[in-house]
From Swiss-Prot:
It is found in: Cytoplasm. Pathway: Cofactor biosynthesis; (R)-pantothenate biosynthesis; beta-alanine from L-aspartate: step 1/1. It comes from Methylocella silvestris (strain DSM 15510 / CIP 108128 / LMG 27833 / NCIMB 13906 / BL2). The gene is panD. The active site is at residues 24, 57. The modification Pyruvic acid (Ser) is found at residue 24. The keyword Lyase applies. Its EC number is 4.1.1.11. Substrate binds at residues 56, 72-74. Keywords: Autocatalytic cleavage, Cytoplasm, Decarboxylase, Lyase, Pantothenate biosynthesis, Pyruvate, Schiff base, Zymogen. Catalyzes the pyruvoyl-dependent decarboxylation of aspartate to produce beta-alanine. It comes from the Bacteria. This is Aspartate 1-decarboxylase. GO terms for biological process: alanine biosynthetic process; pantothenate biosynthetic process.
């Protein structure tokens, strides 16, 4: 089994840090559902401001709140306004990778969803892996892709 990307919240901003809590990250259930992230699921958090990388579990906040609250020890690594990448994982046999299509959500400064993307791995005629980023409208985007900036795949 290999650890692969299950879903991603890219560029979501910390709305609060709560040191006096038992731990975890509190997220808007609507964001979690759209990215396929479950309550109590362990996620990796990468802070784009500080470079800190931590692992914690998800608890659900109020639906529609757009919250991203770091709790307990995690609050020491992320401050309100910090931009994060939150990534869940799945474990699959490598042969199953072409069946995987993790959701990737990008966010504006107010934690509104800007883009709903999916990662796609296929094999070409020679059996080589091909990686793509697929937009909600089905457009294939060229990696690397800057958040919020579409680049069409070269023909």
């Amino acid at each position: 089994m290999r650890k692969l990307v299950g879903g991603k919240l890219h560029g979501i901003r910390v709305t609060e840090s709560n040191l006096e809590y038992h731990g975890s990250i509190t997220l808007d259930p609507a964001h979690c559902e759209a990215a396929g992230i479950l309550p109590l699921e362990f996620v990796e958090i990468w802070n784009k401001n500080s470079g800190a990388r931590i692992t914690t579990y998800v608890i659900l906040g109020q639906r529609g709140s757009r919250c991203c609250v770091l709790n307990g020890a995690a609050a020491r690594t992320c401050q309100p306004g910090d931009e994060l990448i939150i990534c869940s994982s799945v474990y699959l046999d490598g042969a199953e990778i072409t069946n995987l299509s993790p959701a990737v959500l990008t966010f504006d400064a107010n934690n509104n969803i800007v883009e709903r993307l999916h990662y796609s791995v296929t094999r070409d005629g020679a059996g080589h892996y091909q990686f793509g980023i697929v937009a909600e409208d089905g457009e294939i985007l060229q990696p690397p892709l800057k958040s919020g900036m579409r680049q069409k795949r070269a023909s």
